[in-house]
Curated annotation (Swiss-Prot):
GO terms for cellular component: large ribosomal subunit. Residues 258-270 have a biased composition (Basic and acidic residues). Keywords: Ribonucleoprotein, Ribosomal protein, RNA-binding, rRNA-binding. The gene is rplB. One of its GO terms (biological process) is cytoplasmic translation. This is Large ribosomal subunit protein uL2.
């Protein structure tokens, strides 16, 4: 992937960048692997806003991704690399030798015509999936399961990867992208390689309209609201917060408060917390 830079013909184009989509080999998705999805604009079943700053955006079809990778010892050929509007990573269309088609996350370096497979004794190469207990120390992995058979939940965004550090009984030590070192059951599966489209984080939207295409609405600062809308609101002119520290819209402290329950059951599986966390 390379970053496409636009000439500053307008103010909106001045700082705009995008992907050149050089890796994409097919523009129309596989119809049998599509599902329709409705947008709720951040509202729940009562019609009340539960997530702010959402709404609008382009319609999208959901691509059914195989996160489980449990089709063992059946080889598949990479038929195409496609764009997926629902995630930052690209996806690969697989054609299995038994006629089944499936989408997977496209790892870095995967090309059309490559062979991938799943199982306990498959080769250690990008796109292959196997249990953590069979992956050598130091290998980069993604799409990691937290519960055997549930499907990959960790390390799925563009350019992300984790690393196998070692083994401890029934667990495998994995260092995640955040720097957190965590124990994961060795029977859980992961896919070899780094998630592709690694330069996605360098893309600059350049204008507000592209943000709206993604279904994201404008966000107002609390200090410009009325006092009945936000703890920072009210006052004459540019008034200070007026509190010992910044607050959330719901009156809770916004900084320095732990966002994870220290009594959570999985806390004992975390060997070292992520960077910046105590």
């Amino acid at each position: 992937m390379a970053i496409k830079i636009y000439k500053p013909t307008t103010n909106g184009r001045r700082h705009m960048t995008s992907s050149d989509f050089a890796e994409i080999t097919k523009t129309k998705p596989e119809k049998t692997l599509l599902e329709s999805q409705s947008h709720t604009a951040g509202r729940n079943s009562y019609g009340r806003i539960t997530v702010r700053h959402r709404g609008g955006g382009h319609k999208q079809k959901y691509r059914i991704i195989d996160f489980k990778r449990n089709k063992d010892n059946v080889k598949a050929v990479v038929n195409a690399i496609e764009y997926d509007p629902n995630r930052t990573a690209n996806i690969a269309l697989l054609h299995y030798t038994d006629g089944i088609k499936a989408y997977i996350l496209a790892p870095k370096g995967l090309k059309v015509g490559d062979i991938v497979e799943s199982g306990d004794s498959v080769d250690i190469k990008p796109g292959n999936a196997l249990a953590l207990k069979n992956i050598p120390t130091g290998t980069s992995i993604h799409n990691i399961e937290l519960k055997p058979g549930k499907g990959g939940q960790l390390v799925r965004s563009a350019g992300a990867s984790a690393q196998v550090l070692g083994f401890d009984g029934n667990y495998t030590l994995v260092r995640l992208q955040s720097g957190e070192v965590r124990k994961i059951l060795s029977s859980c599966r992961a896919t070899i390689g780094v998630v592709g489209n690694e330069q996605h984080s360098l893309i600059q939207l350049g204008k507000a309209g592209r943000k709206r295409w993604l279904g994201k609405r404008p966000q107002s600062r609390g200090s410009v609201m009325n006092p009945n809308d936000h703890p920072h609101g009210g006052g004459e002119g540019k008034a200070p917060v007026g509190r010992p520290q910044p607050m959330t819209p719901w009156g809770k402290k916004a900084r320095g408060i732990k966002t994870r329950d220290v009594k959570k059951a999985s806390e004992k599986l975390i060997i070292r917390h992520r960077k910046g966390s105590k």
